[in-house]
Amino acid sequence: MRIVDICEVTKPIASPIRNAYIDFSKMTASLVAVVTDVVRDGRRVVGYGFNSNGRYGQGGLIRERFRDRILEASPQSLMNEQGDNICPHKIWSAMMTNEKPGGHGERSVAVGAIDMAVWDAMAKIAGKPLFRLLADMEGREANPKVFVYAAGGYYYPGKDDSALRAEMRSYLDRGYNVVKMKIGGASLADDQRRIEAVLKEIGSGAQLAVDANGRFDLETAIAYAKMLRQYPLFWYEEIGDPLDYSLQAA
C-alpha cells in the first residue's frame, strides 16, 4: 500500500463576490488529488482536497516541497501501526520535514489541502465515511448529526437588500435555521440596514450571525458591537486580524 502520486491544479474562483477583505474575482484555489495503489470496488482510491476559498492556490509550494517529501518517503513510514491504512499524522510529519516550526502564511494552506486529501483517501481505504472513521479511532459512537449553518451575504456589484433577502430566504427554504452574512465591507450604517433587512426576512424562526472577516481595528470593532447589541444575533465573528494581539486581548 502506497501513495503513488499527488496531483494539484490551481483554478480561478472567478466570482464577483467579496467580503470585507477579499475580492474573489482575483482569487484562486488549489484542488489536490492523493492517488494510492489501493483498489476498492474496482476503482483506484483517490483522496481529494482543496484549500480555503479565502486563500490563494498553493500549487508552487505543493510541487516544490510537500509532494516530493511524501512520494520519496518509504511507504511503510507513512502507514498506521496496524499496517492496513495510511496514517495522516505520519504523512503530515513527512511534509513538515526540514520546515521551521511555527509560522503564519502560505505553507499552512498548501499542507492543509494535501492533508484534507489524505484523510479522504484514508476513509475510502477503510470503507467508511470519515466522520465514522474518526469516531472509531477514538473509541466513540459517531453522531450522525452535526450543527451546520449557511454562510453567505457577500457583497457583489448591484446586490441590493431585496437580493440579500432572497438569498437568505433560499437558505431557509433548504432547511437551514442559522444563516451568516458578511459585514465590514460597507459603512456601518449600510451594514446596519442590511442586517435589519435580513432579520426582517428570516423572522423569529431562524438565527443570524455576522462575520467581519478580520477587517476591523479596535475602535471600529467596538462601534459595530454597540450597534449590533440591539439585535438578537447568534454571533459576531472575526472582528480583527488574528495576529493583532493587542486587539484580541482588549
Give the predicted meaning of each segment.
Residues 167-182:
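Catalytic domains of carbohydrate-active enzymes, especially glycoside hydrolases
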Residues 1-59:
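Structured beta-strand/loop patches that form or line metal/cofactor-binding pockets in enzymes
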